[in-house]
Amino acid sequence: MRPKLLSVEAALFLALPELARAATRKFDFEIGWVRANPDNAFERPVIGINGQWPIPTIEVDIGDRVIINAHNNLGNQSTSLHFHGLYMNGSTHMDGPAGVSQCPIIPGTSFTYNFTVDQPGTYWYHSHTAAQYPDGLRGPFIVHDKDFPYAKKYDEEVVLTLSDWYHDEMRSLIPQFMAKSNPSGAEPVPKNALMNETTNFTMSVQPEKTYLFRVINVGAFAGQYLWFEGHKMQIVEVDGIYTEEAEAEMIYISAAQRVSFLLTTKKDTSKNFPIVASMDTTLFDVLPPDLKYNSTGWLVYDKKAEKPVPATVDSLNPFDDMTLVPYDKMEILGKPDKEVVLDVKMDNLKDGKNYAFFNDITYTEAKVPTLYTALSAGKDAEDPAVYGTYTHSMVLKKNEIVQLVVNNLDSGRHPFHLHGHAFQSVYRSEEEAGIWADANVTEKNLPKTPMRRDTLVIYPNGNIVMRFKADNPGVWLFHCHIEWHVISGLIATFVEDPLALQETIEIPKNHLDACAAANMPTKGNAAANTEDFLDLTGENKPANTLPPGFTPRGIVALVFSCICGILGVAVVAWYGFSAPVGSTSAGALSAGLVENDSGDVHSAQKGPQETVVSPTGDARSH
């Protein structure tokens, strides 16, 4: 037995330097409203931390323990924090989505996140409650790595965020979006694009130096094309996964994606160069005349030289991220044990509003956070039914290889994000290619070492195929990261090895207190039933479906037909009952008063003869 003991001691001794380097990083966050005007066009309330906005960048080292004490000072909104891209291995209860892995943090209360970071790379943190993060609660989360393979190739590191920006708060935009008057589901178009939360980003650079850029799209909606005039990028990381170097002149970054690259400056310092980020306007249903879809910054070599206007580009041809090769050259996972196929569509329900669906299910939050159902359901936790119909939960067995197929039956792009994992991106079709089942692609056609990331763009009416290993017990969302589509229900849930969760996860009292404050149960199925976990009576449900034959286009046509009909009848009635020229009702004349169109009362007077166009188009005078 002595040799075995010595080997353990030796292992502990060798681990001591790593343990010594790991630290506990503690953050106290007071989350509250501040005012800001990032685009110099409109000052508005934004959600800041500790009285400041933009919110702080969190920087830690791999192996560090992170403790965040979050206190909600918003007064009028609940909140939560999600750490986008972090696997939260062994800590699924720290993932952050309210109603999924925790209860919301209601105003005036606090919540503690406590987890260890065991992966390097570029991430971000943001609210995961009620589509709140576009109001400003979003910031970078950087995990440094002493073993970064490109550490000796750069001189300086830069974090660069891109985002769209709205002048109205989400609490006013959401009711406009989810309204009967918007049956086609047209998403609100942002007012501006920001670069590092400003429209005037400048970066002083030195000649012949190499910079590591960590770029994060923290926006709510728009993907962005990014390029540096006169310079090339060497991509070295996407979504926390190191890659082999890949040269690019232009990249596309969807909402929630991250790309890191090396950029080497020129020897000549006589000129400055534009940095251009251009929003993907194909996502917008309309292009308002005041829309500013480009954001321009500058690489400044000479502060005295002019900052040139960006040159016009003939076309937008970004680097294809599907061609990236992971640095560790991890090979494609083997034959899938389980295939999940999700069909994306947008449609209306009986309340007249437009919703988003996976396989005809639009996500509706359960009465009990899904994780808490998994922890309290006993052996029933392996039955997807206990999580409710409308959380769209799928139970995964330990270590099974999952092939996740998404067929986009919609005419727009979507960035799909998986919590708890980086998946292998094994296939992406072109636009209008149809569904995966018709693709005629075999295993030998798939890449040997596919790119891995946690957020992948699917093209209009196309498909994507991803693979991952169910080796991280937890409750993990899969959803579109366009925040408007999160609101409208484009979410599914993976419940991974729930019996292992029951053995390893203990919910802290601080988290249970948050549920008590929010008056939310912490045990039971989706309907909060603790007696019979298969009885879903009383579960939260979306509106009923429409009768067959109704489509968004048909609803729009019906609505406008009704409006036109009502207006037509009103005009005819008004014309038929109008008084002869020069006359006014006796009562109004006797009082010397008449009402104008707005209802204001004015002294009676004869106006000039008016010409009115009848519903038939004839001009009539009265």
Curated annotation (Swiss-Prot):
Residues 1-22 form the signal peptide. GO terms for biological process: cellular response to iron ion starvation; reductive iron assimilation. GO terms for cellular component: high-affinity iron permease complex. It is a single-pass type I membrane protein. Disruption phenotype: Produces wild-type amounts of siderophores and growth at the same rate as the wild-type under iron limitation, but accumulates high levels of free intracellular iron. Does not affect the virulence. Induction: Expression is up-regulated during iron starvation. Cu cation 1 binds at residues 82, 417. Its main location: membrane. It is an enzyme of class 1 (oxidoreductase). The keyword Glycoprotein applies. Residues 575-622 are cytoplasmic. Pfam families: Cu-oxidase, Cu-oxidase_2, Cu-oxidase_3. Keywords: Cell membrane, Copper, Glycoprotein, Ion transport, Iron, Iron transport, Membrane, Metal-binding, Oxidoreductase, Repeat, Signal, Transmembrane, Transmembrane helix, Transport. Its EC number is 1.-.-.-. Gene3D superfamilies: Cupredoxins - blue copper proteins. The keyword Cell membrane applies. Cu cation 3 binds at residues 128, 419, 479. The chain crosses the membrane at residues 554-574. This is Iron transport multicopper oxidase FET3. The gene is FET3.
